Amino acid sequence: MSWSFLTRLLEEINNHSTFVGKIWLTVLIIFRIVLTAVGGESIYYDEQSKFTCNTHQPGCENVCYDAFAPLSHVRFWVFQIILITTPSIMYLGFAMHRIARQPDEQIRRLEKTKSKKRAPIIHRGAMRDYEEAEDNQEEDPMICEEEEPEKDSEKGDKKKHDGRRRIKQDGLMKVYVLQLLFRSVFEVGFLMGQYVLYGFEVIPFFVCSRNPCPHTVDCFVSRPTEKTIFLLIMYAVSALCLFLNLCELFHLGIGGIRDALRQKRKEIQESRKKKPSAPPNYHSVLKKGKLPNGKPVFPGNGVSEGFEMPVHELDRLRQHLKLAQEHLDLAFHLNPSADIAHASRSSSPEANSIAAEQNRLNLAQEKGVGSREKSGL
C-alpha cells in the first residue's frame, strides 16, 4: 500500500500548524502510519488463515471468524487514519486557497519589507559650526550621510513563535480550531468503537455456535499475546493524539487571551500622550528669559503675549547687554586669532545668551509700543 500521497499532504500541514500540531503530526506519521503499515501487516497477515476451529464442517470457520472479528484490526486502523487526517487535509486545502487569493501587491509588500535595507541617515554635520570658521577656501558639505549600524531589530521582528500568529494573520484561526474539534471528536469516536469491537485483549480462543457449525466449536487465534500488545499500543497512540489535540486547543485559547491583553495594554500606552521634549541646550540658553511663573518668553506663547515687561527691567537688560558686549569686544581684541574669534562668536554660550536676551529685549519693546498705541487710541 502506497502512503506517499498522504505523507506529502501531511508535510504541507506542518507548514501551517502550531508547535503542538507539529508534535501531533510526528506522532501520526511514526506511530500510526508507519507502525500500521509495517507492524500491522506483518502481525495480521495470517489472521484468517491461521484462525482454526476443531471442525471440518465447510463454512464453519468463515462464519466463526466473522463473529470473532467483524472488522479486521488493520482495516479499522487504516479507516481511522483516513478519517482523522481528513479535517487536516481539508484545512490545508482551504489554507492554500486562502493564501493564493491574497493580492499580489500585499505579498510583494511583505517581501519588500523583509528585504529592505535601512536608508542612510542624512543630517547636518555636528561639527559644521566649527568647520565654517575654517578659512581654508574649501566648501564644506551642508549635510552628511551616516549609515546606521545594523541592530538586532531583525531578531526582535523575527520573534520565535510556534505558528499561531501566522495562522491568525492569514485569517485561518477559526478553520484551524474547527478542524481540531473534528479531529478530537473522531478520536473519541474511534476509541469507543475500538473498545466495543475488540475490547482490551485478543482472546486466545473463541467459542462459536453459529450455523452451519454442527455444534459448539472452539476456534483458536494465532499469536494472541502479540496482537494484544499491538492493540494496547494503538489505544495509547489514540489517547496521546487526543491529548495533543486538547493541549493545542488550550494553547490557542491561552494565546488568544494573551494577545487580547497585550493589545489592550498597547492601546493604553499609545493613548497616553507624551510631552514634546525640547532640543538640546534649549533650556540652558533660555533659562534667563523666563517669566515670573517659570515659563520662558517665546513668541506664540499664550502667556507671554499678555505679559508686559516693566520699564526698570528694560533698563536693566540694556545695561546688562551693553556690559556683556564690552566684555566680548575686550576678549576679541586680546585674542587676535580670527578663527578662534569667529568660532567663539558662533558657538560660545555667552554669545547664545546675549542673543537670547536681545530677543527678549526686542520682544519687550514691541509689546511696550503696542500697549502704548492701544492706550493712545
From Swiss-Prot:
Residues 1-18, 97-174, 250-377 are cytoplasmic. Residues 131-151 have a biased composition (Acidic residues). The keyword Repeat does not apply. It is found in: Cell membrane; Cell junction, Gap junction. InterPro entries: Connexin, Connexin_CCC, Connexin_CS, Connexin_N, Connexin_N_sf. Keywords: Cell junction, Cell membrane, Gap junction, Membrane, Transmembrane, Transmembrane helix. Residues 129-163, 266-286, 341-377 are annotated as: Disordered. The keyword Transmembrane helix applies. Residues 40-75, 198-228 are extracellular. Residues 344-362 have a biased composition (Polar residues). The chain crosses the membrane at residues 19-39, 76-96, 175-197, 229-249. GO terms for cellular component: connexin complex. It is a multi-pass membrane protein. GO terms for biological process: cell-cell signaling. PANTHER family: CONNEXIN (PTHR11984), GAP JUNCTION PROTEIN (PTHR11984:SF117). A connexon is composed of a hexamer of connexins. One gap junction consists of a cluster of closely packed pairs of transmembrane channels, the connexons, through which materials of low MW diffuse from one cell to a neighboring cell. Belongs to the connexin family. Gamma-type subfamily. This is Gap junction gamma-1 protein. The lineage of its organism: Eukaryota, Metazoa, Chordata, Craniata, Vertebrata.
